């Protein structure tokens, strides 16, 4: 069976790209199609895709394309329609909700969509909102979004079967597309896990994609006010990193005789560094709004690190309250501070966190995806 994998674009390495990587591991002979491939923006993750056979669209040849990701979504349906899938038996789209990969001309192939979420910006979910402050941009943006909702709905009809990455996303698919879906949770790397008993856990940790919808500012403000040490890792977008640094406090701690800020920004890190950070953290803090699934909190649990998360979206499915983590109910620093103050008293256990994370292993993902696809292509 000849298989093609289709992904919106490859410019950053997040949860969706981890799923694409796992699909490619499951189907190593599959060709990969994407509208744009920008390896220079992938940082320490660039090598992951180096040996892949990646086919790009005409968008790859547009000057300044890296800074035009948002406006280029208007051309993305044409980009995916431009690919020739004749001769393929199966197309698996990894649809992040950024572009419209389900617009492909599938010919005689079957199209199965692994849906990370319907486009958040089209259906009222948390995303970048700065453009709405400008009246003219808001009028233009809302008009284009109306057109793109029609495009998205038409593309959804092209899909033969949906796989959702969480119950949260399954409900969105039903609500906006009137389609059923089976849930297969994304794969989480657990094989690098090490024994952490006796290791000092001296700080709180947050990180991942530092976008505004992740609300890292709430975490920075809460930890600043309490004066507790916080490490922040990840790539920042659209000037958000500078905003976070400006709001970070000017309180200092003495560490080995050296005066250091309580808030430390580490930038982008590779997987080994990330897991080491997680193993040394008291808890991983997560304030994302309407999160589709949330791989990073599960990775933290896999290192025996509990999670304190905003009660929203997919993390409600992954965190066992009182066992592998805690929730705060209001998206503000005061609500998070309440949980930070009682965290030590809860005495959450490493083994509970690890046991929970194992339910989201890569091996489980391989087995479930292969089973679904086998049944649907039989």
Question: Where does each model-flagged region fall?
Answer:
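Conserved donor-binding/catalytic core segment of Leloir-type glycosyltransferases
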Residues: 188, 196-214, 220-231
């Amino acid at each position: 069976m000849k298989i093609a994998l289709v992904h919106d674009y490859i410019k950053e390495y997040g949860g969706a790209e981890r799923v694409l990587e796992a699909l490619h591991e499951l189907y190593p002979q599959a060709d990969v199609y994407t509208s744009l491939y920008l390896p220079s923006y992938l940082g320490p993750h660039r090598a992951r895709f180096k040996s892949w056979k990646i086919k790009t669209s005409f968008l790859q040849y547009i000057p300044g394309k890296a800074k035009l990701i948002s406006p280029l979504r208007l051309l993305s349906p044409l980009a995916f329609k431009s690919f020739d899938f004749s001769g393929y038996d199966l197309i698996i789209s990894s649809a992040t909700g950024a572009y419209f990969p389900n617009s492909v001309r599938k010919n005689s192939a079957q199209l199965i969509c692994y849906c990370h979420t319907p486009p958040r910006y089209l259906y009222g979910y948390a995303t970048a909102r700065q453009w709405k402050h400008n009246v003219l941009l808001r009028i233009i943006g809302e008009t284009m979004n109306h057109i793109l909702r029609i495009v998205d709905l038409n593309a959804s009809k092209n899909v033969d079967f949906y796989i959702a990455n969480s119950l949260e996303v399954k409900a969105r698919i039903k609500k906006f597309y009137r389609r059923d879906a089976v849930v297969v949770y994304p794969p989480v790397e657990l094989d690098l896990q090490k024994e952490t008993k006796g290791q000092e856990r001296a700080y709180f940790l947050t990180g991942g994609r530092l976008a505004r919808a992740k609300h890292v500012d709430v975490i920075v403000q809460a930890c600043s006010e309490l004066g507790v040490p916080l490490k922040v890792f990840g790539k920042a977008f659209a000037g958000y990193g500078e905003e976070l640094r400006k709001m970070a406090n000017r309180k200092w701690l003495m560490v080995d005789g050296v005066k250091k800020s309580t808030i430390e920004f580490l930038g982008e890190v590779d997987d080994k560094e990330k897991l080491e950070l997680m193993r040394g953290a008291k808890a991983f803090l997560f304030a994302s709004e309407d999160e589709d699934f949330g791989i990073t909190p599960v990775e933290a649990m896999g290192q025996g690190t509990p999670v304190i998360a905003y009660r929203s979206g997919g993390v409600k499915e992954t965190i066992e309250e009182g066992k592998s983590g805690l929730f705060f109910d209001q998206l503000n620093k005061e609500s998070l501070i309440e949980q930070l103050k009682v965290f030590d008293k809860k005495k959450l256990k490493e083994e509970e966190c690890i046991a929970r994370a194992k339910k989201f292993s890569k091996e489980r993902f391989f087995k479930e995806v292969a089973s679904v696809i086998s049944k649907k292509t039989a």
